[in-house]
Amino acid sequence: MKLADLSSPAFLENPYPLYETLRRQGPFVSIGPNALMTGRYSIVDGLLHNRNMGKSYMESIRVRYGDDALDMPLFQGFNRMFLMLNPPVHTHLRGLVMQAFTGRESESMRPLAIDTAHRLIDDFEQKSSVDLVTEFSFPLPMRIICRMMDVDISDAISLSVAVSNLAKVFDPAPMSPDELVHASAAYEELAHYFTRLIELRRAQHGTDLISMLLRAEEEGQKLTHDEIVSNVILLLLGGYETTSNMIGNALIALHRHPKQLARLKSDLSLMPQAVLECLRYDGSVQFTIRAAMDDVSIEGDVVPRGTIVFLMLGAANRDPAQFTDPDHLEITRKQGRLQSFGAGVHHCLGYRLALVELECALTVLLERLPHLRLANLDTLSWNQRGNLRGVNALIADLH
């Protein structure tokens, strides 16, 4: 398997046959100078938990775009996001942001998620068919994160466009010049929007997510203005498109396994298990990247210091060495720990909120529209992103 495969039409349509080949080729596959890829569960899990495997974001930018790109506001902004940093700076920033994403805070969002799902369905349930991407799975997480930030819902459309233009930053292949221009403009638009909002919140002392970050302290230190701007943008990115794609991918997986869907409809108490299994089966985030900060030994192999490793989460979730019959969706599967949210110090901070949103979205949809049928199940158009896997449209017949 080669790095170029991650943007090939075959991979975008269905990455799992390529993952099977990757696992068969060995514990690691070389994909370039000082670059490796792995899809085996035990190695992915081991490296995610290894503290000598860290982030090397600006070096990856230098390699892909050259030295001049290091001063671009887009990449400087991303480099302030705690997702891109290593301890101890990562620990400090994550600790501050984490206060808004505890289990208690995430669970408190359940009534809002349920109400949002009902309101969205109210708007389209009388139609004969609907695109669930534009009418349900995309607006649901955006409305919730906007409520958490106390952002005017009328701004959600422009914010979602900007976020979508930023999403290409997470792909392994370099952006084209046009894509780089659009991503830079999107970052500047979001930075300007949230700078204005942050200044308003400083005087209001509210209870929203942005106000919580302004007040958050750990060991007497607060976030700087630029850190708040970058990490609010990160939370918007993480709380929107990844979750919306999860909803769509879960619906596709369930409808491609009608017996499992029927079982879930007959007993919605299985929803928490079903959501986890759908995430294992076809998650939205397909891989993450780590850099060896020192020589790292694992299962008889050595990852040399300075090596970049592509950890294929989607491949690990289908590894038969970890999961029995991994290519089959089984909503009552006795879970081994799935890799959809990563692991270790960079484990997804918002995973609890994502699970709440998924459980509520699917439960309300199945309760309100029990006869819903996906009309384009055999002609799906998958987006052109190597990492954030999802479909461009999901047409459903409602009655």
Swiss-Prot record:
Its EC number(s): 1.14.-.-
InterPro entries: Cyt_P450, Cyt_P450_B, Cyt_P450_CS, Cyt_P450_sf
Positions of heme binding: C348
Sorted UniProt keywords: Heme, Iron, Metal-binding, Monooxygenase, Oxidoreductase
GO molecular-function term, one example from the UniProt record: monooxygenase activity
Cofactor list: heme
UniProt xrefs under PANTHER family: CYTOCHROME P450 YJIB-RELATED, P450, PUTATIVE (EUROFUNG)-RELATED
Family: Belongs to the cytochrome P450 family.
Protein's recorded name: Putative cytochrome P450 133B2
